[in-house]
Amino acid sequence: MQGPLHFPADDGIVGGMRSNQDVAAPKLMTVNDYFKTPETLKPMELAFGVLRVADAPAPRHQSAVAHLFLALEAHVRARQLGRMWLSPLDIVLDDRQALIVQPDLMFISNEREWIVRDRVRGAPDLVVEVLSPHPRIGRTEERVGWFGDYGVRECWLVHQDRREVAVLGFADRRLRERRLFKAREPVSSDVLPEFSMSLEDILDV
């Protein structure tokens, strides 16, 4: 089912940063600087040199991520389509511009397996973001823009409060399609065309 797509006004915060001229500009980091930071279970990203750290995810966020991962992993493995990956996993979208993200889930096809090296360096075919009440990193529109700009083919936005899944399709690095799934509608994918899973199963309701 197609429908209008709505983003939260702000999906999260950048700790300690405010839009105030009196606040000092954050220190910019390189990709190498980022990889030297101590490991943490909290979501992190490097947004054009600015380190962003969010709160640890809530239990219901992790529940939705787990349900999706198990279903997608079984689908992908049975058909030998590629590999599913689970956050925290750094995705280097742009080394020179210092842009690193950590989507909740990502699918990398056999055709793109070359991007998995010492790190994942390049765009996955599919990324999944579970949007939760807890503070997330940055704004949804911003992150979706990065995914499209750097070659992600499809992005799922699972909104737990509104109980809906938005599936965004990209082509030629532009947003080409928006589909909205609600209630008992099975969520489908152009990247994984035989996959189907109801929102109830994702959210465990």
Regions found by a protein language model. Give the residues of each.
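Gly/Pro/Ser/Thr-rich low-complexity, intrinsically disordered segments predominantly at protein N-termini
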Residues: 1-205
